[in-house]
Amino acid sequence: MSRIVAIDYGRKRTGIAVSDTMQIIANGLTTVPTHELLDFITNYVKQESVERIIIGLPKQMNNEVSENMKNIEPFVRSLKKRLPDMPVEYVDERFTSVLAHRTMLEAGLKKKDRQNKALVDEISATIILQSYLETKRL
């Protein structure tokens, strides 16, 4: 099987997670500056066998997409142009940052480490992907 890549898109930084080849477990991969994201994903897909890309869909509590969607849509269009055969799906990302902070607390990370926004973004991408993998198994 191939891997699945998840993206927690941000204006400055973007967290990236990847599944194992059996598509059971999500692991944080890295956080990259958003302006380097398209090249990073393109290179990763060339090096690894990737089945699809999951993008965190920023929704508000009232179920409407948030302001950040205006930044995500142009990226997704560029991604689809560069990788036309790669399926791209959106997955609701509500509460992933809150869950990421909770995960860091439960893991016993020190306050300084919990304030590392790049780590929060990477963990958020991991939560998005793990949620997708679990939903897919149902």
From Swiss-Prot:
It is found in: Cytoplasm. GO terms for molecular function: nuclease activity. One of its GO terms (cellular component) is cytosol. The keyword Hydrolase applies. Its EC number is 3.1.-.-. InterPro entries: RNaseH-like_sf, YqgF, YqgF/RNaseH-like_dom, YqgF/RNaseH-like_dom_sf. Its main location: cytoplasm. GO terms for biological process: rRNA 5'-end processing. The keyword Signal does not apply. Pfam families: RuvX. It comes from the Bacteria. Belongs to the YqgF nuclease family. HAMAP family: Nuclease_YqgF. Could be a nuclease involved in processing of the 5'-end of pre-16S rRNA. This is Putative pre-16S rRNA nuclease.
